[in-house]
From Swiss-Prot:
The protein's assembly and partners: Interacts with the flavoprotein subunit within the SDH catalytic dimer.
Protein known as: Succinate dehydrogenase assembly factor 2-A, mitochondrial
Organism of this sequence: Drosophila erecta
Annotated InterPro entries: SDH (IPR005631), SDH_sf (IPR036714), SDHAF2 (IPR028882)
Keyword NADP (UniProt): no
Main subcellular location of this protein, as a coarse class: mitochondrion
Protein family (similarity comment): Belongs to the SDHAF2 family.
Length: 162
């Protein structure tokens, strides 16, 4: 038994010995150059090509107000990009239940009428100017919410009320 153990140790030492030698001969590589970072990076914005038509969002004229609010709450939480998920879900949790039917329709048009979620993000954070058709009372509330004057932590989406 001891003879087998000793043989195994000899073999493992022999197998890994060349590897140890090659590692000891390696020189340290110089650190990579620092990444260039500026605060005035330009946002490249391309026009949507004509050959990729985007489907129109279906209007729901006979949808009850409470059902519409529930749908908008879900859609505010499931945007597909974390930035808008956090901003819109916290905004909807704070304001959506107090919206009138007209305000709810404006919010529906804002989050479902825009084909690119990055546009909503850039408008809400005042990186790009908001187009007139989306510059509504709801967009003003969203911009105030994004400024976060209360300094509320928004690291995760709010819990759903059950």
């Amino acid at each position: 038994m001891l003879r087998q153990l000793r043989l195994t140790m000899d073999i493992s030492g022999w197998i890994f010995l060349p590897w140890r030698r090659s590692m000891s001969n390696m020189k340290e590589s110089p650190p990579p150059p620092p990444l260039a970072s500026t605060f005035d990076d330009v946002i490249v914005d391309y026009e949507d090509p004509d050959y990729l038509p985007l489907p129109e969002y279906p209007l729901r004229p006979n949808e009850p107000l409470q059902t519409r609010k529930q749908r908008l709450l879900y859609q505010s939480r499931k945007r597909g990009m974390l930035e808008n998920d956090l901003l819109l879900s916290t905004f909807a949790a704070k304001h959506l239940q107090s919206f009138s039917a007209e305000q709810t329709a404006q919010y529906d048009q804002l989050i479902n009428g825009v084909s690119n979620d990055w546009d909503i993000y850039y408008w809400a954070t005042d990186v790009k100017p908001t187009p007139k058709e989306y510059d509504t009372e709801i967009m003003g509330l969203l911009k105030e919410h994004v400024k976060n004057a209360e300094r509320v932590s928004r690291l995760r989406q709010p819990d759903l009320n059950t």
